[in-house]
Structure formats: structure tokens, C-alpha cells
Amino acid sequence: MVSTESIRQKSGVSSFFCDFSAMDQEQRKRHSLLVGELLPKHLEMKELPDGYAFRFPNDQVLFAGLSELATLEQLCCPFLTITLELQHDQGPTWLKLTGNDGVKDFLRAELGI
């Protein structure tokens, strides 16, 4: 993960930063593992007016992992709106990361978009 200070410098948005101190050591390890394992599995990324959406295959294990990641992410980044959506007829799973003005710049810096 990118350091808090480098995110602030890259994004130019000082009000958005990951507060990893909001998680204990075990949660930080798990968060890092889930980010590394799950995010590369996205099939598509869409830019939204207030953030980004990532399409994943419809898979129960993947959905459970994304749900756990969303819960941990909310601890360190409470300014994000995190939506996990299963679409009808066994369609894809969407993970949406959105928020107030400036969140999109933060996400670009954090995710290297």
C-alpha cells in the first residue's frame, strides 16, 4: 500500500487518507492479503462521476472475500461509500468505491489509475 503522506502529496487532497491505525495488526495483514488477491481478479473498471466501479465474476468465494475487504476498507477509509452488488440472473459482481468531491483523485493515487 502507498503511505499516507505520499497519497496526500500525489492526490493533493489532504482530507482523504487511509488511516491504517484504525485496524489492528491482524486486520492490516488480512487487508493487504485481500487487496493483493482480489483486486487483480476484476474483469473491468468503469469510471463513475464520484469514483470507480470494478466488475468481478459471479463467484461465492470471491464475493465473500470482497465483502470482507469492504468491511476492512471501511475501517481505514470511512469517507468511502463502498457498494458490493450482485446482479440478477447470476450476473457479475460489482464493487463500487465512491464518495464526496476529491475521492476520485484519492482513488486514482491509491490504486495507480
Residue ranges and their predicted role:
Residues T71-L80, L111-I113:
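A common structural junction motif
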Residues M1-F63, T83-Q90, W94-I113:
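Secretory/periplasmic and organellar redox-cofactor proteins
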Residues F63-T71:
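Amphipathic, interaction-prone secondary-structure segments
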